[in-house]
Regions:
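Metal-cofactor-dependent catalytic cores
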Residues: 1-184
Length: 184
């Protein structure tokens, strides 16, 4: 018997500007191969300003940013002020350990939208400008490989549609062998 992984869309966020945090919204239109309609990070090629300077033609593997509400709760307990949307995430989830999912996992958001996970968010220096010590608080070093961060995972939109706060998230794992997430 296969255990079904199910979570919930706790909050949604979008901003047309390249700001660190994003304001809350009640629903969002996801566009296949693009991201969230009206969000500064949506587009078929990289939209993050630091990455555009290096190579603006690269595919955008960071169309939609997800953070678990459980991380927000943990950081608040440690004294950080991190409301939903504070990390610049588009989607705050509950009930899923996003960092444990392999690359290529697909998440069905509500009835229509499907996104595919591409990797961990690699935070820029703005995270410590937002709150001192936050970068260290979300860092971890696996037994092998580079230092990683648990301040969210990135994804691309496979199938578009509208997502609303409270929608169910259903996870489908890719075929084995599973590839662990790396930073993108």
């Amino acid at each position: 018997m296969t255990h079904e992984l199910v979570g919930t869309v706790t909050s949604l966020h979008s901003d047309g500007g390249h700001n660190f945090s994003k304001p809350s919204i009640t629903e969002a239109v996801f566009l296949a191969g693009i991201g969230i309609e009206g969000d500064a990070h949506s587009g078929p090629t990289t939209q993050h300003l630091s990455r555009q300077k290096k190579d603006a033609s690269r595919p955008n593997l960071r169309q939609v940013h997800l953070v678990a509400s459980e991380l927000h709760e943990e950081l608040r307990a440690d004294g950080f002020d991190v409301p939903f949307g504070a990390f610049g995430e588009n989607l705050t989830t509950s009930g899923l350990d996003l960092g444990e999912l392999p690359v290529g996992s697909t998440l069905r958001l509500g009835d229509d939208v499907i996104i595919a996970l591409t990797g961990f968010r690699d935070p820029c220096s703005q995270i410590d400008k937002f709150q001192e010590g936050l970068r260290a608080a979300v860092s971890f070093k696996p037994d092998t490989g580079p230092q990683l961060f648990r301040n969210g995972v990135m994804s691309v939109v496979v199938r578009g549609g509208t997502v609303r706060v409270g929608d169910t998230i259903k996870v489908a794992l890719p075929a084995e062998p599973h590839q662990p997430m790396q930073k993108v």
